[in-house]
């Protein structure tokens, strides 16, 4: 833990604050995403004073004493609850909406989708013609399907493909690919969960290699002019900024994009536009986010043809609002 802290912060007080925040009891705020229209009279208390600018108006923040996950709104699929730091990781996508790119995002592929939060919030943000939620670990797909069903996310497909297989089935089809990558899970400590070996060099190196493989396969899924969001819930530079440096060097047709609402969270460790939320900021367990755009617009297939290509090529475990044949 201390070794990672020294890499992240040169200031001794900052190192101390980081380590203390990792093991301190979390504020346990909850972010509540309204799947359709937000209620003016929710059954839980909303703390509007605690809402930072990077959270859109249709996502509320509740205090630690509230339990929106046990509310009638949750049971009926009107809301999805997640850690505020997960919303931070998606903030670059909200900037696309603000920059009037919404109409360009019609096909989304979420590569590491379980339990579904980032895909569901992205669907709410863009309302695409199709979202594909992929989860390679079969034991995690039950929760993913359950959440998509409960929130009535459609048109949607849930798949369980290795990233390499998915990349071999379809190419250059997605307007947006989300890679919320499996990682060393260092932020689990903030949630009071065990994270054995999360700060060990071998664990970090293993995840770095795994993340690069997922990123490499994800790159081929992005259509020219499309976007890729890379996010983790860990703190090691190797799994975050170094991966982005490697990715941009390996795939020079991708460039990082600035996110104005996250300017104060800009990472000092990256050469591009990447952003970090730490547990000492008080909004959840922590996150890293970087948004990239693929250059080019030539030979871009119409969205209907791209959706048809995905539907005909990829066999889903579950789907809604899609004629898969």
Where are the regions that the model predicts?
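S-adenosylmethionine
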Residues: 1-325
């Amino acid at each position: 833990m201390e070794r990672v802290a020294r890499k992240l912060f040169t200031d001794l007080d900052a190192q101390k604050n980081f380590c203390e925040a990792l093991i301190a009891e979390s504020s346990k705020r909850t972010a509540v995403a309204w799947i359709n229209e937000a209620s003016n009279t929710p059954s839980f208390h909303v703390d509007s004073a605690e809402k930072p600018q990077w959270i859109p108006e249709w996502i509320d923040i509740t205090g630690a004493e509230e339990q929106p996950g046990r509310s009638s709104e949750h049971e009926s699929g009107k809301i999805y609850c997640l850690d505020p730091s997960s919303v931070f990781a998606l903030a670059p996508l909200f900037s696309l909406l603000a920059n009037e790119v919404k109409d360009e995002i019609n096909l989304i592929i979420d590569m590491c989708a379980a339990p579904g939060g980032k895909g569901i919030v992205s669907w709410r943000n863009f309302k695409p013609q199709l979202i594909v939620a992929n989860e390679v670990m079969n034991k995690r797909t039950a929760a993913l399907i359950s959440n998509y069903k409960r929130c009535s996310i459609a048109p949607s497909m849930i798949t369980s493909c290795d990233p390499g297989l998915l990349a071999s089935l379809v190419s250059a089809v997605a307007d947006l690919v989300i890679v919320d990558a499996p990682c060393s899970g260092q932020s689990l400590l903030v949630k009071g969960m065990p994270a054995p070996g999360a700060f060990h060099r071998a664990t970090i190196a293993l995840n770095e290699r795994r993340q690069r493989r997922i990123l490499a396969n994800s790159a081929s899924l992005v259509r020219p002019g499309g976007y890729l969001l890379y996010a983790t819930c860990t703190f090691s530079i190797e799994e975050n900024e170094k991966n982005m440096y490697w990715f941009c060097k390996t795939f020079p047709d991708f460039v990082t994009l600035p996110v104005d609402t996250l300017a104060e969270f800009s990472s000092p460790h990256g050469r591009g536009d990447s952003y970090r939320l730490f547990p000492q900021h008080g909004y959840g367990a922590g996150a890293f986010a970087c948004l990239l755009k693929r250059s080019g617009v030539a030979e871009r297939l119409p969205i209907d043809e791209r959706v048809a290509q995905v539907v005909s090529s990829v066999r889903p475990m579950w789907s809604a609002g899609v004629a898969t044949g």
